[in-house]
């Protein structure tokens, strides 16, 4: 009689203890930002080259225990003291001690791993590049990341991270590239983010709310993508302060209200301006005609009224003007002539007399079609009374989003399900993985292409032939290496190499999808089961014994970002997505591929010339590219990472660390190619400290001095053979919060021997492109541009 209740109580008590311990472990990670290796046992028989590699061993072994699923056995060779030979791990000479090798880069893109980030990763204090896009990592970003003082690029896109904005990234002094796309971050965007010297910010496809901070104009970024959130509120008038650096901005599908601030006319370097799928109203400011570099203008699916200003149609560089699904009543004769000027124009579903495909007379006489008084919105964007022709409509005044104290509904938008899982209906559904089905949703984005592609980096001046690193064997080249934004090095003091390498296209890996979506389709990669859904990013690099960097093939649908002088912002050119309400067009942003060798710039510092960016016009200090070589079936040693010599002459393929003090380089100019072509391997550059010719595809660690990074050339690195495997440390980090994956839930393939299956080979697996941005970062879902 008492047996049944007793059994039930025991089961309940056991489950309670299990979840309580997991929660306490997660909270412990959040509250404790200090790291201690006292509880981690290292086999005394293991011999390490230096204390830094011993610390890296502890960090990586702790991380290996925190990975619940590794379907491609990517961590099969994560054994022994030769951490530089681990799959996805890349070493380089330390900037402070050229004879000392340290772990300078991690590239696990497209590894499809499930797990969390243990706080021991903070022991990787020499890390400059950290690329994890297109996996199933969940939980929160550990506070111990604050110890990564040299971290230059952080790409966590297309995973299942949760919680509020990871404020720890605001404490990273060398950070230039931040990509948090396709996760489940929520709450407000901190205003301090726009006070940092960043070059690219990608926050699209999350759950951010409570408006865009008023100090947005303080940011020196060249690429800013906040699309597909639920921000609400007005576009800050401070946007006009970004005219010197901003090249591309995507604010589509953010529930924005109010009128378009006339200060946008100061954005003279912007090539892509996308504010589609919002609730913006009023007239289009004639100041748009001052945006001389504008190529893509998308204001579709809003509530704009009045007449199209003739100044817009006189822009000499305009290639695509989409103003459909508004309430415009007329357009200037010059705009009619655009149809014969090889300019794509879409003005359907408006109230323009004499045109086809317009709204009905009933819709055009509705309250939504009436002109409004922009000064009544309280956006503080207008300093003079509106033109007399515009009267305030009787519609209810739109107020900015509620304060952060209000709760955010977790069902607003469903993130893409893992490749094997189906997506449940939600208000905003992102494209499911190639194998998963997309459930109906209010806002559906096109599924990512079925094939995987690794990001490519735009070509920079050819670096001198990479010197061989005698101590270690050549690093394996990874097939799908994380894309890295290559920043143009300063003008070389010595003659450049005889011929430049093919241009590196900086593209983020797009999620796989059955076929390339139509042009400009903004789709998010599907997440994997368990943790928060994530979109797929570029596949992890396949390691081959060739030291040369792997080639990156952009996803068929999402456009890739080409980098010229500085990391290009993602261009979101998306083909039109199938969702009932067409999602905003995005310009696919591809994350920079990981460079196999990492180079550190010479100790001497010299300011590099300002980079010029074409295509996605993103002006900001270019991040150093890192090269990741493909991996062969057997775990090959990582590619060599080199730090540039202390002398002012350009060191061969050194890895540069960006200067500790943040000095923004001149705004880069990006060209955003609409067509997708396989980009060459992208190098990872660390900004050099000394004056020297910029090498092509080297990895730069920001120099300790405040001078801009110098160019570096890639060096062929031959990593030493990995020693016998030793048991990993017995310490096991607690799982992170918000992570549903467990060893029992996800398939975890344990390989008893190192000769386990090599990482899968991904061919052109694109992430959903972000329409309108051509920045090299983890591949976003591709969406056709309207």
Curated annotation (Swiss-Prot):
GO terms for biological process: cell wall organization. Hydroxylated on proline residues in the S-P-P-P-P repeat. GO terms for cellular component: extracellular region. Residues 1-28 form the signal peptide. Keywords: Cell wall, Cell wall biogenesis/degradation, Developmental protein, Glycoprotein, Hydroxylation, Leucine-rich repeat, Repeat, Secreted, Signal. Residues 353-362 have a biased composition (Basic and acidic residues). InterPro entries: Leu-rich_rpt, LRR_dom_sf, LRR_extensin-like_regulator, LRR_N_plant-typ. Pfam families: LRR_1, LRR_8, LRRNT_2. Glycans are attached at residues 73, 79, 255, 269, 320, 346. Modulates cell morphogenesis by regulating cell wall formation and assembly, and/or growth polarization. Together with LRX2, component of the extracellular mechanism regulating root hair morphogenesis and elongation. This is Leucine-rich repeat extensin-like protein 2. The gene is LRX2.
